[in-house]
């Protein structure tokens, strides 16, 4: 599954990552990390912006949606509409029900504790960030010198 997702990243012209609440923080983290290695990526956390973004997706788009419960309406709406327009869509959720398979290219099952979405014991972002680290490492490894060069260039830009 990770290999397929990295393949989607390699082929996408544009990547959009969305999530609300603590999942939105993970979306922003993905944007920052993957931008630094050359991916044209944006993150969205505003409910209205997420819904409106569905209009602009096409077969060259890749959409990542983060929803611990898998039921955040804005996130599922964007993924469903983008999928119907030919985009690749990936839902990250702890809820791996059958209902997801018809609208998403991939459903990444996250490990979970009971009531993880409440965030009162372990950060709800934690399982998302772990899987993002795995995807990041796999993606960088496929073309290490170019990706590391891009990362170094972003460091230089920050020092200017």
Question: Model-derived features: where do they sit?
Answer:
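Glycine-rich phosphate-binding loops that contact phosphosugars or nucleotide phosphates
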Residues: 10-130, 134-143
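A short, well-structured juxtamembrane/interface segment
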Residues: 1-11
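A short, charged, Gly/Pro-tolerant segment at domain boundaries
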Residues: 145-160
């Amino acid at each position: 599954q990770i290999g397929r997702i990295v393949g989607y990243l390699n082929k996408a012209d544009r990547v959009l990552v969305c999530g609300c609440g603590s999942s939105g923080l993970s979306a922003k983290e993905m944007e920052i990390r993957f931008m630094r290695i050359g991916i044209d990526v944006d993150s969205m956390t505003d409910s209205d912006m997420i819904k409106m973004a569905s209009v602009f997706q096409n077969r060259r788009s890749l959409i990542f949606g983060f929803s611990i419960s898998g039921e955040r309406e804005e996130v599922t709406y964007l993924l469903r509409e983008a999928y119907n327009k030919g985009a690749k869509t990936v839902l990250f959720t702890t809820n791996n029900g059958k209902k997801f398979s018809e609208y998403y290219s991939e459903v990444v099952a996250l490990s979970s504790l009971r009531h993880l979405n409440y965030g009162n014991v372990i950060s709800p972002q934690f399982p998302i960030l772990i899987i993002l680290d795995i995807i990041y490492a796999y993606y960088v490894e496929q073309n290490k010198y170019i990706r590391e060069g891009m990362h170094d260039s972003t460091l230089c830009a920050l020092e200017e």
